Amino acid sequence: VRRILWKNKMDINNLGRQLYRQAQRHKGFSTLFSVNTLAGINSNNNNVYQALINENLGRTPVGLLGQYHFWKSDITIHRCSDWMASLRMASDRVIGTESGTDNVKGYYLADGALYTYVDGEEYTDIFPCWDWRKVPGVTCYQEDKRVHVMGWLEKQNKGSFVGNVNDGNVGMTSMELVRDGLYAKKAWIFTPDYVLCLGADIHSDSSYLVNTSIEQALLKEKLLHLEKGKWNAVKDVCFSADKPERFFHHQTGYIVLDGKGRAFSEKRTGLWNDIMKIYPKSEQVTQNIYTLYFDHGTFPQDASYQYMVLPASSLEQVRRFDLSSFKVNAARKSKVDDNTAKMQSIKQLGV
């Protein structure tokens, strides 16, 4: 359980269907209380229990670093000393999420949802104000109608090629998305410095727009866009595949390598009742949110995307990031080798 906590908050991908107010913080504290109880029952593991408690209360540096894949849940966790990433998928073996009177809008929560955490407050109580068709990392249709409410045992993905390979520090996760007439090959490469996200062979049989969300999180500062070597605040900007585009917010950078789309921020108001029916319909919440996404158009055929997320970075680090050879360390360099229907790969020299 230590892997899914970050700064005493539980990762969204591991909240299950209970996306209630302050769920991340409450479930984080609940875990610490349970661990403290275990310490009184089994003193042989006191060091392990205390390490989890100390880390999440900020008494000690983050531990249990590296990458781990929960293959029975189709979830990848990547932990570094100053940031964490979590990826959730579904397959023909794994039901990725469920609903009922909880998680009413969570239809796409297991279609490649990628969250990155630095201070742990990136998505706090964002759920009533989310565009649930732009969950970070997800490729899906953009419809005007209400998101479908799932049942308890509803399969979400017919794809079987879903999994991960890693050496404990770096790794690659892949997902074949086959759902509702939409097909995509999605891949994520996790390193100590960034997450490289690839999408290929995206096609659908529907006239609905298809988007891939890069990010949708709380706006804490101005959203910045690098233009002619200078960072400028933007509220709404479109980007194309003509050249790489760099964005920055708070402590995280985003570099779009391939694909056209939009980056914008706005104020939204939503209802907690739309997420969990236990809340009254009068209970509104307003949040400032920023969003980055790719627009693949209608009836896409062989569409693709490439982007990088650089958590726990600075403006200067994102501005200077060398795209001709992604920096893994001083001795090793890598580049995107392929991102097609036949192969998605990254070549790392010196391995």
PLM regions: where:
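Extended polysaccharide-engagement surfaces of secreted carbohydrate-active enzymes
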Residues: 2-351
